[in-house]
Amino acid sequence: MAIDLSLIINEKEKKGSIESQICHLTERIKRLTLHLKKHSKDYSSRKGLYKIVRRRKSLLVYLTKNNFVCYEKLISQLGLRRLKTH
């Protein structure tokens, strides 16, 4: 279930790049989603999940504005939907 960062980003960029942060947040979202399927009344975990989703969304918005090609590549590799644009 863990996401292999070497498939997505280079060795130099693994530490704190936007791409690696999005990958780690996606992994945490998947883990919390599985947890909430078992424990549907765990409201504090649900609140934490919403917080992580908002953080990932803001990083994805930042990535679309600064490096759209990298954004396209990342969402295709992670299996995410495109952001809604107004």
Curated annotation (Swiss-Prot):
Q: Name one GO cellular component term.
A: ribonucleoprotein complex
Where is this chain primarily localised?
A: plastid
Entry keyword Ribosomal protein: yes
The record's section on InterPro entries has: Ribosomal_uS15, Ribosomal_uS15_bac-type, uS15_NS1_RNA-bd_sf
| SUPFAM superfamilies linked | S15/NS1 RNA-binding domain
GO molecular function terms listed in the Swiss-Prot or TrEMBL record: structural constituent of ribosome
One GO BP:
translation
Cellular compartment(s):
Plastid, Chloroplast
Pfam families the UniProt entry points to? Ribosomal_S15 (PF00312)
Q: Name the UniProt key words of this record, in alphabetical order.
A: Chloroplast, Plastid, Ribonucleoprotein, Ribosomal protein
> Quaternary structure?
Part of the 30S ribosomal subunit.
User: Which family, according to UniProt?
Assistant: Belongs to the universal ribosomal protein uS15 family.
Designated name of the protein: Small ribosomal subunit protein uS15c
Q: Which organism is it from?
A: Psilotum nudum
